[in-house]
From Swiss-Prot:
The lineage of its organism: Archaea, Promethearchaeati, Candidatus Thorarchaeota. It is found in: Cytoplasm, Cytoskeleton. InterPro entries: PFN (IPR048278), PFN_sf (IPR036140). Pfam families: Profilin. GO terms for molecular function: actin binding. Has no profilin activity against rabbit actin. Belongs to the Asgard profilin family. GO terms for cellular component: cytoplasm; cytoskeleton. Gene3D superfamilies: Dynein light chain 2a, cytoplasmic. It comes from the Archaea. It comes from Thorarchaeota archaeon (strain AB_25). Keywords: Cytoplasm, Cytoskeleton. This is Thor profilin.
């Protein structure tokens, strides 16, 4: 039996041209439900959710500051101005409290990589 989150991560990685390089699922309460083994969301999950809810102008993940480029009630896209990548949060579905958090290479196009992550997130409806 395959892991639906790993499948979603693989989909985002492939569709983004290998730009999505870290992936996780968190709850609105800040609980980490799944994360790729190349990063740790536990210290920042609650802060990330607070940033989305408050539409913060910046967010910190793993001691790296990202400036918010776009924020809606269901998503946040932020870029590190020093070139440390792009952070994307997107809600799995409107009735769930589950969110995908992804990190993409600094060379990625923010809008394009957001679409790739959002599509992958939507495949997780009812699965996590």
């Amino acid at each position: 039996m395959s892991d639906p989150v790993m499948d979603a991560y693989t989909q985002a990685y492939n569709s983004s041209g290998n730009m999505v390089q870290a992936f996780g699922v968190i709850s609105e309460s800040g609980q980490v439900l799944w994360q790729s083994n190349n990063w740790d969301l536990t210290a920042d999950a609650s802060t990330l959710m607070s940033a989305v809810k408050s539409r913060a102008s910046s967010v910190i993940q793993n001691q790296v500051k990202y400036s918010t480029m776009r924020s809606t009630p269901e998503s946040l896209v932020a870029r590190n101005v020093q070139g440390s990548g792009i952070l994307i949060l997107t809600k799995i579905d409107t009735t769930s409290d589950r969110w995908v958090v992804a990190w993409a290479d600094a060379q990625a196009q923010p809008d394009g990589v957001y679409v790739d992550v959002d599509r992958a997130a939507k495949t997780l409806r009812g699965k996590i």
